[in-house]
Structure formats: C-alpha cells, structure tokens
C-alpha cells in the first residue's frame, strides 16, 4: 500500500486543521495562514512540509479516503468467501465515501479538484486503494472464490466501477422511487461486483 506522506501526530493535527478549514469555507478560500492558526503552528512550519494548500488537501483526501475505504471493509468471519468480503467492502466503501462530509463539500464547492483524478492521473489514495484491492484479489484467487485474472487489471477495473458509483450516483438516483434510490443502486452495484468476481 502506498504510504501517506505525512503520517505522524504533528501531520495529523495539520490535516485535521485543513479539514476543518475546507469544511468551513471550501478549498479555494482556505489559506496556509488559516491552517497554521487552527493547527497551532507557524506558517513556516507548514511551508517546510507542504508547498501550498493544494498539497495539504491532497494529503488530507488521501488520509480520509483510505480511512473510509479500510473502515468499510467487513470483519472477516470464518467461512466468509473472499469474493463476498470484496463485494461487501466495496459497496460499503462507496456508501461511506458518498456520506463523507469532505466529499460533499468538495463536490458542492470545489468539484474541479476531483477532475484530475477522474480524467488525467491516479492520485495517492487511488494508488493505496489499488494496493489494497490487489492484496485481497490475490487472496480470492488463492481460495478459489475470485475469478483468476491479471491482478492489477482486475483491481483497476474494480476501482473504475466503484469510482463511477461513488462520484456519479447522485446524478442517477430518484429519492422518491424505491427502485431508483441510492440503496437500490448500491444493491445493483453489489450484483455487478458479484458477477464480475465469480469464477
């Protein structure tokens, strides 16, 4: 798994501060001065580790998205197929991501921040998630519950599927129709993943 660049308590305090700033005013209106003040550190301390607000927000998104994904993975119980663990974890991860307040704020106020990670390149959180997926896919190959295939390609295909649900689901749902609400689409996602993974 790709490590988060600033994974220690001082960095966490700074990332907590940038999260609070972004939730309050959005990314564009967040300044290094605001973050330093909230974190109780000098601006120079911030600039030694992060060149600008965008790099801070990038590390924040990595921390938050990876935590949401790993926190959504169900506990492995005896007799549980790895395929079910993957499908259930990915569906829960999409639900957690969609409910995340930082995701809502970025989509509502600064959606252009997500475009590079959808159209141009993978970010650190995507790389970390691909690593997690590759590991669990290998387990599924070994126990026979997941269709054999090129692990990295399978991981990337799964991430493409769940990203589309996480980022675009609200454009397809109809809250007043139980057949087209968010829960119905998450059930559909579960079926897609099951069919994709089954040998």
Name the predicted role of every residue range.
Residues 1-3, 92-95, 127-143, 160-161, ...:
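C-terminal peripheral helix-coil segments that are non-catalytic and often amphipathic
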Residues 98-120, 167-171:
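Amphipathic alpha-helical segments used for helix-helix packing
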Residues 40-50:
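Short hydrophobic/aromatic patch on the recognition helix
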Residues 69, 105-107, 116-143, 152-159:
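Amphipathic alpha-helical packing segments from all-alpha helical-bundle domains
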Residues 59, 72-103, 155-158, 186:
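Hydrophobic alpha-helical connector segments
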Residues 17-21, 96, 161:
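Short amphipathic alpha-helical elements of helix-turn-helix/winged-helix folds
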Residues 1-25, 29-38, 54-58, 63-70, ...:
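Basic, helix-initiating cap at the start of DNA-binding domains
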Residues 49-50, 61, 133:
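Tryptophan-centric aromatic hotspots in well-structured domains and transmembrane helices
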């Amino acid at each position: 798994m790709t490590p988060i660049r600033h994974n220690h308590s001082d960095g966490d305090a700074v990332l907590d501060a940038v999260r609070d700033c972004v939730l309050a005013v959005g990314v564009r209106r967040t300044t290094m001065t605001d973050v330093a003040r909230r974190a109780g550190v000098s601006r120079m301390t911030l600039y030694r580790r992060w060149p600008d607000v965008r790099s801070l927000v990038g590390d924040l998104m990595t921390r938050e998205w990876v935590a949401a994904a790993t926190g959504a993975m169900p506990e492995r119980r005896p007799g549980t197929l790895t395929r079910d663990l993957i499908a259930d974890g990915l569906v829960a991860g999409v639900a957690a991501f969609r409910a995340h307040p930082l995701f809502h704020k970025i989509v509502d106020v600064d959606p252009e921040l997500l475009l590079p990670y959808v159209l141009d390149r993978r970010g650190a959180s995507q790389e970390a998630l691909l690593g997690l997926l590759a590991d669990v896919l290998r387990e599924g190959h070994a126990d026979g519950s997941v269709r054999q295939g090129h692990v990295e390609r399978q991981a990337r295909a799964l991430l493409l599927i769940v990203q589309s649900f996480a980022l675009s689901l609200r454009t397809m749902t109809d809250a007043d129709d139980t057949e087209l609400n968010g829960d119905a689409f998450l059930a559909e996602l579960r079926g897609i993943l099951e069919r994709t993974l089954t040998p």
